[in-house]
A protein has these predicted regions:
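A short-motif feature that recognizes glycine-rich, charge-decorated loops
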Residues: 1-186
């Protein structure tokens, strides 16, 4: 192999390294980071628009038993009348609140689609779990979880003050059931 051929092949990696280095220097000088256009930015699409961190009080009712949880700054969640709760129970409360903010309903059944149907058809005449969420200024949202859909993958839910019925992923209702169980075992 001649010296010219070897030189012809070896200069390409050097040029590519110089171009990459120049690109990095340009990014440092301008302060710009490369934008990942293939990634989608997160957007909360739940029924509660306020950030979960703003929630300071949660009231959960199941089978006529109400439990009230308060967020106490650094101490985390406490159960009114029961004091501190386990870290696992606190995670259930935090996740349940977060799901109200982040989990978009799978479907919304408008009132006009429900003509001739009663709340009992969705288990909302006697909800499995009812949750009321408050921030420092007052109530944010009150939701009622009914029965599962026929496939068992989702659950019917209504929101106080709003018409219609929502179909929400089953894990949302399961988390609220876990919160209710935490309060009722005390």
């Amino acid at each position: 192999m001649s010296a010219a051929t070897r030189f012809g092949r070896n200069w390409r990696p050097g040029i590519l390294a110089l171009l990459a280095g120049g690109y990095l220097v340009a990014m440092v000088v301008t302060g710009a980071l490369p934008r990942q256009r293939q990634l989608i930015e997160f957007e909360a699409r739940g029924l509660m628009r306020e950030p979960p961190e703003s929630v300071v009080r949660v009231e959960v009712t199941r089978a006529g038993v109400q439990s009230v949880f308060l967020r106490d700054g650094a101490k985390g969640w406490t159960l009114v009348g029961g004091g501190a709760i386990t870290p696992e129970a606190a995670r259930h409360v935090s996740m349940a609140v977060q799901f109200l903010n982040t989990s978009e309903p799978l479907r919304y059944l408008a009132q006009k689609e429900l003509v001739g149907m009663t709340p009992a058809a969705f288990g909302l005449d006697r909800p499995v779990v009812t949750a009321r969420v408050h921030n420092a200024q007052g109530p944010l949202i009150a939701v009622n979880f009914g029965t599962d859909n026929p496939e068992g993958s989702a659950q019917y839910m209504s929101v106080d003050g709003r018409d219609g019925v929502y179909l929400i992923s089953r894990f949302v209702g399961s988390e609220w059931s876990a919160v209710a169980a935490t309060g009722s075992t005390r």
